């Protein structure tokens, strides 16, 4: 029986993401500008927020590492086998799935994306997120590489909002107002805080689903 360290699985169709392909491409191009400025051959993203920002995929770790490799001509998410092809469907880029048959298959998947012929000499990582364990192993694998922290560069990029982001922020504020109004309606003597919170949350969740029918919601997958 073959037990692969990693593989690709493109099942289903690409899903509609929160932002357009043009928006994600602009973000990745800006990231590559940061790479050029800082002489980076590769970036390894590990945080949920940055992977979501540049690819559209939001992971749920449950103790497993997730990542995204960005080079001058590639962008690939790396996900655990438990998610199957969901990360591919819910991102605008390619995806590699690593298995649990061997320890550190996550790292083998990274190497598979960039190959062994021309190892990167400078690698950008998120020092405010990457674990000590992963960082030590990256140092061991890419022994000749210099690692640079790019977390602040990424944060500055995220701070400047596009028109598409502003639209979602405004809609989010509108939906939050609806939730607050529903909470006020349910505040009565003897009513539990839990039931009041449920009323506000349910109102917002239903409005979010109505406003974004193509999105994927908690406990629905």
Positions of predicted regions on the chain:
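Active-site cores enriched in adjacent His and Asp/Glu residues with nearby glycine-rich loops
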Residues: 19, 34-51, 130, 177-221
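A composition/biophysics-driven feature that prefers long, compositionally simple stretches
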Residues: 1-179
């Amino acid at each position: 029986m073959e037990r692969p360290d990693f593989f690709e699985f493109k099942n289903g169709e690409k899903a509609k993401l929160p932002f357009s392909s043009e928006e994600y491409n602009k973000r990745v191009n800006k990231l590559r500008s940061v790479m050029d400025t800082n002489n980076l051959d590769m970036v390894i993203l590990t945080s949920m927020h940055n992977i979501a920002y540049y690819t559209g995929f939001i992971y749920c770790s449950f103790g497993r590492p997730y990542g995204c490799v960005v080079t001058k001509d590639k962008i690939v998410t790396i996900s655990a086998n438990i998610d199957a092809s969901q990360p591919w469907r819910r991102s605008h880029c390619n995806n590699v799935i690593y298995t649990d048959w061997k320890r550190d298959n996550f790292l083998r998947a990274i190497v598979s994306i960039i190959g062994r012929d021309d190892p990167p000499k400078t690698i950008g990582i998120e020092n405010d997120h990457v674990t000590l364990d992963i960082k030590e192993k990256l140092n061991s694998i890419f022994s000749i590489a210099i690692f640079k922290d790019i977390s602040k560069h990424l944060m500055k990029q995220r701070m400047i909002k596009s028109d598409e982001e502003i639209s979602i922020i405004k809609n989010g504020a509108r939906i939050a107002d609806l939730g607050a109004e529903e909470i006020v309606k349910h505040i009565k003597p003897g009513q539990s805080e839990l039931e009041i919170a449920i009323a506000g949350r349910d109102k917002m969740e239903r409005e979010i689903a109505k406003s974004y029918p193509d999105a994927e919601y908690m406990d629905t997958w």
